[in-house]
Amino acid sequence: VPNRTRPRSIPLPVLDAAPARDFLAEDSEKKEKCAVFGVWGEPGGVRLTYWGLYAQQHRGQESAGMAVTDGDHLLGHTGMGLVAEVFTERTLWDLEARPDRRNGARSATPIRGAIGHCRYSTTGASLSCNAQPIVENYIGGTVAVAHNGNIINASLLRDLYEQKGHIFHSTSDTEVVVHLLASPEQQSSPDPLGATLRRLQGAFSMVFLFPDRVEAARDPWGWRPLVLGEMPGGHPVVASETVALDAIGATTIRDVRPGEIVTLSDRGVESRQFAEPAERRAHCVFEHVYFASPASHLFGRTVQLVREALGETLAKEAPVDADYVMPMPDSGRSAASGYARASGIPYREGIVPNRYVGRTFIKPTQDERTTAVRLKLNIVGEIVRGKRLVVVDDSIVRGTTTRAKMDQLRAAGAKEIHLRISCPPIKHPCYFGVDFATRDQLIAHERSVEEIRKFLGVDSLHFLSIEGMLECSASAKFPAEHFCTACYSGDYRLDVEQPAPKGILERRQLKMFS
């Protein structure tokens, strides 16, 4: 049975703690998932991991963490908040100094490898116990794990191992993976990690840190991105997005293949398949629409170019006479520029974000939410007053904050508001790593476009078609059939009759004590 190393075995330094903070409600409609990073053999690996996470901060802002090894011991640090809050200069120095677990003496052995994680929770609450990487002792040694995705059979697996006497310290699906790896069934296999991954159902891009190596793995469907790169000195690195590799001066080599485990060690890069890739892949198209950095190259395309193409296609599908094309900051900018270019309507920015609002509201009331939205986005009255506007946004989930934004434009004197959305209506929940609301909270679930238009108070509303979206995302290497559109179409690649909702592991613990 694995034991959490934080209470014993490896003394962690007393580090500066960032305060836990909830996020502004308007950001909760569509949440980023997580980012992972790993490097082996590179001098300054701690700093590289820090910058690799910093470059992927858009994928998760609830917590961050890092684990390092000197070839003998593992040391980890996690905390709630942004990367720059969790890792102070003192924190990074402590990780680089590597306290020896026996006597706390400073080791002269250089750091051999590191992995990192920044998180938005999709299974397990936003609590410090769920921050990653998780560092555990088990019969095979010590391991640290960081995960992007969602294991839909995590609750069933946790039930199984609790009945066998395993003790869990968190409510995330990632800890379930560690218990699987530690079990005798997997440890008796010639490839314990591969045997572990074959037991998982769902989406995962993971990095594992052992004393002598980093291992990176991706599920057979390829839901979440994971890329392999190389530093100028030849040392290997992995990350969720290519933007992280660019930030540290690494060269992108290739994607980690679906069903593949890539090992980074002193022997270089080694590869093995733990499962055959699915015949029909399931690359998350919402990565192109919203989640990924515009600067990343993902699923065969540069994200910025995909988003501009989404806007161009939207202009062809839903033309309208207007004075200006206006983006909803920040995620609507790329599509709005494409719409303006294809339509010939001038591009103007009349909605200005206040970047200093959004992370200090703790459990706001509805009145506070409304005020927060007004503070978050300021309307330039002289630009919008008396004008017919095409407002472009990437998506609508619940619709309440979109309505508030449209009310602001109307109050500022906009003559007409034509809302254009660069993806189809989101009608179904995601069980594979995106924190979409339940069906009854999705505004497009069992509602027509006209009903949504009336609720939002706009003059016209159009969503991009699924076909138009896939035409923009697809490439010769990744044709349209290899993208997951379940949140739009309900076409799930795996059986989700009994899916694992985000809070299922918390509810299980509450039942135990009720």
Place the predicted regions along the sequence by residue:
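Active-site proximal loops enriched in glycine and acidic residues that flank catalytic Cys/His/Asp
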Residues: 218, 240, 266, 327-330, ...
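PRPP-dependent phosphoribosyltransferase catalytic core
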Residues: 197, 212-213, 249-255, 276, ...
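Flexible loop/turn segments at secondary-structure boundaries
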Residues: 44-46, 122-123, 153, 223-224, ...
